[in-house]
C-alpha cells in the first residue's frame, strides 16, 4: 500500500493550492514563458494525506510530510510539476516535452496510480526516472492521457528503422 491517500482533480491554475500556484507563476515569469493562463492546456492537483502509522515507525523514519500538494501543468512545450509538503517545502520541476517520455501507471500492490516520467528535466545532468503519484479518480487518467498525447505530438516517434544511423537495409535502401 502507498503511504498516502491521494485525491486528484482537474482544475484551473487559479484553483491550485497557493504555494503551487505561486511557484508556477514565478517559473513562468523567470523563464518568460508567456501568460500562464493562456499557455496552459491542462492543469490538475493531487492532495496526498499521510496514512496513520505507529509512533515507532514515525520515529525511525523521521518527520515526513503529513500532507503533500502536487500540481501538474501542461503547455504545448512544457510539463511542469510542483510539490509542496508541510515539512519539505516547495519543489518545482519542469521538462521540455521533446526531452521526456511518460507512461500511465496503475499498480495494485502498492495501490497507486499516476504518471511515470523518464528523460531530462530542466537542470538535470543526467536522465531521470520517477513517478508523480495521483489518486484513483477519472481526472488522473484524463490528465495522464493529455500529457502522453502532448509528448507524442511534440516528439513523434520515428517510423523508419535505423541501424547505426543508416536506414534499415544499408545505404540507399529503406
Q: Model segments located where?
A:
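Hydrophobic, Leu/Ile/Phe/Ala-enriched alpha-helical segments that form helix-helix packing faces
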Residues: 24, 28-32, 117-119, 147, ...
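Acidic/proline-rich low-complexity IDRs
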Residues: 32, 127, 133, 163-165
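Anionic N-terminal interaction surfaces
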Residues: 1-72
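Short, surface-exposed polybasic-and-hydrophobic patches located at secondary-structure transitions
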Residues: 111-131
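Terminal and domain-flanking low-complexity segments
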Residues: 18, 135-174
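Generic structural motif
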Residues: 100, 120-122, 135-137
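Phosphoinositide-binding peripheral membrane targeting modules
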Residues: 56-114
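Short amphipathic beta-strand/extended segments with alternating polar/hydrophobic composition
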Residues: 92-97, 126-136
Amino acid at each position: 500500500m502507498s503511504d498516502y491517500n491521494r485525491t486528484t482533480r482537474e482544475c484551473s491554475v487559479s484553483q491550485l493550492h497557493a504555494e503551487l500556484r505561486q511557484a508556477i507563476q514565478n517559473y513562468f515569469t523567470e523563464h518568460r514563458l508567456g501568460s500562464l493562463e493562456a499557455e496552459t492546456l491542462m492543469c490538475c492537483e493531487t492532495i496526498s494525506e499521510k496514512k496513520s502509522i505507529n509512533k515507532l515507525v514515525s520515529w525511525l523514519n523521521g518527520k515526513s510530510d503529513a500532507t503533500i500538494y502536487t500540481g501538474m501543468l501542461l503547455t504545448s512545450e512544457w510539463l511542469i510539476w510542483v510539490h509542496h509538503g508541510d515539512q519539505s517545502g516547495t519543489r518545482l520541476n519542469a521538462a521540455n516535452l521533446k526531452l521526456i517520455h511518460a507512461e500511465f501507471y496503475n499498480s495494485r500492490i502498492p495501490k497507486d496510480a499516476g504518471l511515470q516520467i523518464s528523460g531530462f528535466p530542466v537542470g538535470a545532468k543526467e536522465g531521470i526516472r520517477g513517478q508523480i503519484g495521483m489518486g484513483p479518480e477519472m481526472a488522473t487518467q484524463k490528465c495522464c492521457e493529455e500529457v502522453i498525447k502532448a509528448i507524442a505530438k511534440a516528439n513523434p516517434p520515428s517510423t523508419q528503422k535505423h541501424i547505426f544511423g543508416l536506414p534499415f537495409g544499408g545505404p540507399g535502401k529503406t
